[in-house]
């Protein structure tokens, strides 16, 4: 028994005294270091694989994590002086501050002080810098936008990750970047890829002595859009000196071939942080370049809403498309005169003529008859008052006005006059260009698509099946609606006839002029749009589908303060259709 106790005592002595020194030495000599690997961000490509958002390849510079100790500060400063000498555009104090900001006695990973140096700049300094054990040169990438402002509101940009971003997205802690707007934001999780790591055992000099584990950073491939750069450039050309929005969308699938919000801004200005001067220039621009008007521009829809309202009349007003209604120059109710857009009026009209010539009084009368609830029910089915589901962040749902909406949001009762002016897309009614484009596709196909920009995520093709939202009666009456739109473009007395004469294919369309300032209905002789101050002029709409007999695309355009709708938007529509034809999308 005594011998056994002696053996146990001897073993404890060995472990606690002799082995302690050996293990202690190893502990001070070997530390596990985990280096996080960040992937290159996925590219955003157009439908023909032309880059919309790409990556410049280069290098980053990192320093030994132990140079922040007081005794090592002279070494840190010497290394920084060498770096600045080779790259004179870098600032020594800024580099030192960046290092010390990230320095911690608990950190054993190299500290990045320069996130990106181009290949060209690094080539002449690479050999000299890599002679130092304190400096690490690693592969790096930097986002850039090869087309500058093209489709800026769609593509979006990346920027420095905030504390809140990092709390919600651990990858952004290591990349330092996150998608801020547009598709860069909406698909950020896909585009940023997945972090990797290298776990190594290092000695006190921070030199690796053993590889413990490794996982490569994973770039999740690139994202391909439905956008065609060449078609997008056509939109840009037409809106060079205009404000507003334009959308070209496949009516069957909802795939967007081109979409612009104007004015645009140069996405590359945001790489590394936008200058104060440039920021102020954009913020103070009265045409609001920071608003993505495709999804957040909310405008009175004006007469482009009349197709949906007309469908509601056919369902609830006990009429058909050929029922003729007297349409004098105005409709009088409650002591107010609700005037037609033309002082002479239109004598009489059925639904098809009311669409062809945009007969306001036809809509005034029948909206009074069926009431706002019936109209709103039809229009809600067609997607108004709700988001379309387009793959962009923070979409507005607009306003589909009803008595309950007005009471709840404005604390005011509903009046018959509200119903009457809502029937021509005025008053409280507000919609977005993407809602109008989607609604136009519904009129063309009888189904409601989900607008979308993405075509492929990596090797996975995206699918957004359209929704079957109309009842059988509504579907049966769409042909009459389409005929009214066809005649608006192709009959000599149609509101858009002269404006779209140059189109290479037959269109179905509807124009709309949406007032931005109130004009009393009692005023018979109104100021001409061209004589108004710019900001008082009406917004100009046109929406179309084409070709008429076999619809493939919807084109929706709004020109802010454009005045006469057909004159402001018709030529733009024709130019877009010609480009679609030239690119082979239509015969």
Model feature map: region roles:
Residues 581-587:
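Gram-negative outer-membrane assembly/targeting C-terminal domains
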């Amino acid at each position: 028994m005594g011998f056994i106790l002696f053996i146990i005592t001897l073993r404890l002595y060995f472990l606690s005294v002799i082995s302690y020194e050996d293990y202690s030495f190893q502990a001070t000599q070997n530390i596990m270091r985990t280096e996080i690997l960040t992937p290159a961000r996925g590219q955003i490509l157009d439908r023909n694989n032309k880059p919309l958002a790409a990556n410049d390849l280069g290098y980053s510079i990192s320093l030994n994590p132990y140079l922040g100790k007081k005794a090592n500060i002279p070494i840190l400063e010497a290394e920084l002086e060498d770096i600045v000498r080779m790259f004179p555009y870098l600032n020594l104090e800024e580099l030192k501050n960046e290092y010390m900001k990230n320095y911690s006695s608990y950190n054993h990973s190299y500290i990045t002080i320069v996130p990106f140096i181009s290949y060209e700049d690094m080539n002449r300094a690479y050999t000299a810098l890599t002679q130092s054990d304190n400096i690490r040169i690693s592969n790096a990438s930097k986002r850039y936008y090869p087309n500058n402002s093209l489709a800026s509101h769609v593509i979006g940009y990346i920027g420095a990750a905030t504390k809140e971003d990092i709390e919600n997205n651990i990858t952004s802690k290591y990349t330092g970047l996150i998608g801020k707007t547009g598709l860069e934001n909406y698909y950020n999780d896909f585009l940023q890829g997945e972090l990797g790591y290298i776990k190594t055992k290092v000695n006190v000099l921070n030199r690796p002595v053993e590889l413990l584990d490794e996982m490569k950073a994973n770039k999740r491939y690139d994202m391909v859009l439905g956008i065609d750069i060449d078609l997008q450039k056509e939109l840009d050309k037409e809106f060079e000196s205009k404000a507003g929005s334009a959308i070209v969308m496949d009516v069957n699938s909802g795939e967007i071939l081109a979409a612009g919000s104007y004015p645009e801004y140069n996405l590359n200005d945001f790489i590394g942080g936008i200058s104060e001067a440039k920021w102020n220039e954009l913020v103070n621009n009265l045409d609001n370049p920071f608003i993505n008007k495709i999804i957040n521009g909310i405008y009175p829809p004006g007469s482009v809403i009349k197709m949906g309202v007309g469908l509601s009349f056919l369902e609830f007003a006990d009429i058909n498309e050929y029922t003729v209604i007297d349409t004098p120059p105005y409709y009088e109710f409650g002591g107010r005169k609700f005037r037609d857009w033309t002082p002479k009026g239109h004598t009489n009209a059925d639904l098809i003529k009311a669409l062809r010539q945009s007969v306001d009084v036809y809509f005034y009368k029948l909206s009074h008859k069926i009431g706002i609830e019936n109209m709103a029910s039809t229009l809600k089915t067609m997607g108004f008052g709700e988001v379309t589901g387009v793959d962009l962040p923070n979409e507005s749902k607009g306003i589909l006005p009803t008595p309950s909406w007005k009471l709840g949001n404005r604390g005011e009762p509903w009046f018959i006059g509200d119903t009457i002016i809502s029937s021509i897309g005025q008053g409280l009614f507000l919609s977005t260009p993407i809602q109008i484009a989607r609604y136009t596709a519904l009129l063309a196909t009888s189904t409601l698509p989900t607008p979308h920009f993405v075509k492929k995520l990596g090797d996975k093709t995206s699918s957004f099946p359209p929704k079957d939202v109309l009842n059988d009666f509504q579907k049966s009456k769409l042909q009459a609606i389409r005929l009214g739109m066809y005649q608006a473009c192709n009959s000599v007395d149609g509101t858009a006839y002269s404006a779209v004469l140059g189109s290479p294919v037959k269109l179905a369309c509807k124009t709309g002029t949406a007032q931005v300032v109130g004009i009393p209905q009692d005023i018979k002789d109104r100021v001409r749009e061209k004589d108004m101050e710019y900001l008082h002029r009406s917004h100009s709409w046109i929406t179309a589908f084409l070709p008429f007999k076999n619809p493939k695309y919807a084109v929706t355009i709004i020109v802010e303060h454009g005045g006469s709708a057909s004159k402001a938007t018709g030529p733009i529509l024709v130019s877009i259709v010609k480009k679609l034809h030239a690119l082979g999308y239509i015969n």
